[in-house]
Amino acid sequence: MEHFDVAIIGLGPAGSALARKLAGKMQVIALDKKHQHGTEGFSKPCGGLLAPDAQRSFIRDGLTLPVDVIANPQIFSVKTVDVAASLTRNYQRSYININRHAFDLWMKSLIPASVEVYHDSLCRKIWREDDKWHVIFRADGWEQHITARYLVGADGANSMVRRHLYPDHQIRKYVAIQQWFAEKHPVPFYSCIFDNAITDCYSWSISKDGYFIFGGAYPMKDGQTRFTTLKEKMSAFQFQFGKAVKSEKCTVLFPSRWQDFVCGKDNAFLIGEAAGFISASSLEGISYALDSADILRSVLLKQPEKLNTAYWRATRKLRLKLFGKIVKSRCLTAPALRKWIMRSGVAHIPQLKD
């Protein structure tokens, strides 16, 4: 049975960043359910916008995005729609439009060969015994059993590691549903849509590489019905759909209290969305995935006396920032306050008409 310093479950942005930064300094194994190349297998349903905080992480790491990761077009504003109030406003935003699956594969490709990576793999079981973490996973057609001193859950909203560590922990969840359509709009755009009759979260649209992506986060019970109802409503705001080319869905976490942020215990750690590190106001998680990976890298390499306590303390600033997003979300999803903000015209950039 092979033993490692660190076992990382999941190679989204958080897991890939951590594996890259620990390479050559610790003996690392990393498991991921995505394939190494191509579009076969699992791909993360995601709008694919890189926020300024995520961009800053790449600046710190000296990384530049390859052209095949960047999508077309690049848009500098978000059309914000309040359906009930029939209000539309344009707010400046500095997102980079990316192909999310290509981005994830590129992040994995940066992991040095010294890290033992298993693509298209499935983690079957984890447990702690004799001060070690045991991991059973399936890859290359057969089951393998390894041990590790440290276990890292970078496995997203449905984190197996989080469920093992905190079996009674409950966090609010939504089903994120997206459909892709051939682009019909004469001028591509991003949008953020609020309709409290549909969801107490929000919906979105993105123009990307000749497609129009429409999606949102909805209650788990009847999300598909609510999604369809909202699509019908959006014709009043000049949204054009046609026949769906592709439909996709996944679970998304929605932190709503301080206790929703969980960092791990017993030499197991959670990073990215697995820890609840996702913005409640925008559902953006890449920047917090990268930041939490960098924080954990620092803790693991410094080897303080109590690693879990050190990681909890080191993420305090990040958790406070995310708690601020919870407060912001409550403001944005409060109909009266949102209507007042949008009607005030603050930060709105009117579009010139011919």
Curated annotation (Swiss-Prot):
- UniProt-listed Pfam families: FAD_binding_3
Output the Gene Ontology terms for molecular function: FAD binding
**Where, by residue number, does the polypeptide cross the bilayer?**
none
Output the Gene3D superfamilies linked to this UniProt entry.
Answer: FAD/NAD(P)-binding domain
Q: Which SUPFAM superfamilies match?
A: FAD/NAD(P)-binding domain
Question: Can you tell me which family this protein belongs to?
Answer: Belongs to the CbrA family.
Tell me which PANTHER family the record gives.
Answer: CONDITIONED MEDIUM FACTOR RECEPTOR 1 (PTHR42685:SF22), GERANYLGERANYL DIPHOSPHATE REDUCTASE (PTHR42685)
Q: What is this protein called?
A: Protein CbrA
The top of its lineage is: Bacteria, Pseudomonadati, Pseudomonadota, Gammaproteobacteria, Enterobacterales
Q: Which gene encodes it?
A: cbrA
